[in-house]
Amino acid sequence: MIQVLLVIICLAVFPYQGSCIILESGNVNDYEIVYPKKLIVLPTGAMNSPHPCCDPVTCKPKKGEHCISGPCCRNCKFMNSGTICKRARGDDMNDYCTGITPDCPRNPYKD
């Protein structure tokens, strides 16, 4: 729902330009939240996006790319499964990328 509202707001503010809203998700107290990370505004049909992964017309990853941003996204591709995306602190355990999403899932074995 938040994503749709952001796109509507963006289109209302920039009705004659294509834009790319990069959303980053996080987890706060077991509730999934989505918040804007960066707004890229380009003329409609622009061939070059300032973000190498973002298609400015569709606001999605460019053809052949997996992701735009996130702790498990590097150079427009998902990081390998098992890559540490969040280091352990205190009694906490490391969190690892899955290789199929740009998000860093919480370790299910945490207390």
From Swiss-Prot:
Domain Disintegrin, residue spans: 47-111
Keyword terms: Cell adhesion impairing toxin, Disulfide bond, Hemostasis impairing toxin, Platelet aggregation inhibiting toxin, Secreted, Signal, Toxin
Localization: Secreted
GO molecular function, one term: toxin activity
Pfam families referenced in this protein's UniProt entry, alphabetically: Disintegrin (PF00200)
Prosequence residues removed at maturation: 21-47
Motif Cell attachment site per UniProt: ranges: 89-91
Presence of the UniProt keyword Metal-binding in the record: no
Matching SUPFAM superfamilies: Blood coagulation inhibitor (disintegrin) (SSF57552)
Main location as per UniProt: secreted
InterPro entries to which the protein is assigned, alphabetical: Disintegrin_CS, Disintegrin_dom, Disintegrin_dom_sf
Cystine bridges: C53-C76, C67-C73, C72-C97, C85-C104
Subunit description: Heterodimer; disulfide-linked.
Family per record: Belongs to the disintegrin family. Dimeric disintegrin subfamily.
The protein, known as: Disintegrin DS-AN
Upper classification of the organism: Eukaryota, Metazoa, Chordata, Craniata, Vertebrata
